[in-house]
């Protein structure tokens, strides 16, 4: 689905679910891309992106510092004009699924436009617990907003508010299975907010490497609320920022760092090799597991 007119938007709006099949693209020439489920705000409606989908609102560009692109919004419920302000929601599955199997590679590029993804699930008793997540990423995902912001909000009644990711093969080296990049220069560049009534708020799953990068000076905030477990669960994650603050709030459930660790600020060999970012990690319970050989927990910053 392609719009070539400069600044023209693509709006896909449904009163129920929205689902795409595999290997499909939605492309605009710097216009907005909006997927709006449950538009009548009655009875719910999820969003499912098929495997290997590409959303690009910046005329095909995919750079780290692009500007001028359109917004990309995945959500549901009430709204104004052509933009939903609520959540894509489901009582029988995940609110939003980014891919449907571990073989997936979801690509989202906004080229300076803001990216907003909101999903909610009240599902219970699913064969696969991951289908009870507010937002769940299957396989690999590359998300770049250029000079725009990235916001993800997920809520779940039973499993993870936001879950990253289910890889094709579980390895603690190799290609990043999550690469989330913003070059917003001020304010909040990346905000991930997840809550669960019976699970982890925001979870970075499995052994494979993942990265969340703020290249332009904006802040990174990860806020997780869990019940009976951690607010934020971390494994083999880089949270890097050139100068904007890095904030992690785990609430009463706290923050759990598993045996492949977490790296804050900057890291040699990454896209950010120097940093002046300040770091705040906050929670009632902060747990750091014994590290596997060759892995580290670190803060590399002059802040």
Label each PLM-derived region with a short phrase.
Residues 1-6, 16-27, 32-34, 39-49, ...:
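Extracellular beta-strand scaffolds
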Residues 298-303:
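Short, intrinsically disordered, charge-balanced linker/junction segments flanking boundaries
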């Amino acid at each position: 689905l392609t719009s070539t007119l400069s600044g023209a938007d693509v709006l896909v709006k449904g009163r129920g679910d929205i689902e795409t099949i595999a290997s499909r693209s939605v492309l605009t020439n710097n216009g907005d891309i909006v997927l709006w489920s449950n538009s009548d705000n009655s009875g719910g409606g999820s969003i499912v992106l098929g495997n290997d989908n590409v959303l690009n609102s910046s005329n095909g560009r995919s750079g780290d510092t692009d500007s001028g692109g359109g917004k990309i919004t995945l959500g549901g419920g009430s709204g104004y004009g052509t933009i939903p302000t609520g959540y894509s929601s489901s009582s029988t599955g995940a609110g939003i699924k980014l891919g449907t199997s571990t073989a997936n590679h979801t690509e989202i590029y906004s080229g300076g436009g803001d990216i907003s993804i909101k999903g909610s699930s009240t599902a219970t008793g699913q064969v696969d617990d991951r289908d009870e997540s507010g937002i769940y990423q299957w396989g690999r995902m590359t998300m770049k907003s250029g000079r725009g912001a990235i916001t993800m909000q997920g809520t779940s009644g039973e499993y993870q508010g936001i879950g990253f990711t289910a890889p094709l093969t579980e390895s603690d080296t190799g290609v990043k299975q999550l690469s989330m990049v913003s070059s917003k220069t001020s304010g909040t560049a990346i905000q991930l907010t997840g809550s669960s009534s019976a699970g982890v708020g925001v979870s970075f799953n499995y052994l494979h490497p993942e990265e969340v990068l703020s290249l332009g000076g904006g802040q990174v905030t990860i806020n997780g609320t869990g019940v009976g477990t951690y607010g934020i669960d971390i494994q083999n994650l880089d949270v890097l920022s050139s100068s904007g603050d890095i904030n992690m709030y785990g609430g009463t459930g706290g923050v759990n760092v598993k045996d492949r660790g977490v790296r804050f600020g900057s890291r040699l060999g990454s896209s950010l090799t120097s940093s002046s970012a300040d770091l705040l990690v906050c929670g009632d319970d902060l747990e750091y597991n014994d590290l596997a050989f060759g892995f580290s927990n670190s803060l590399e910053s002059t802040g």
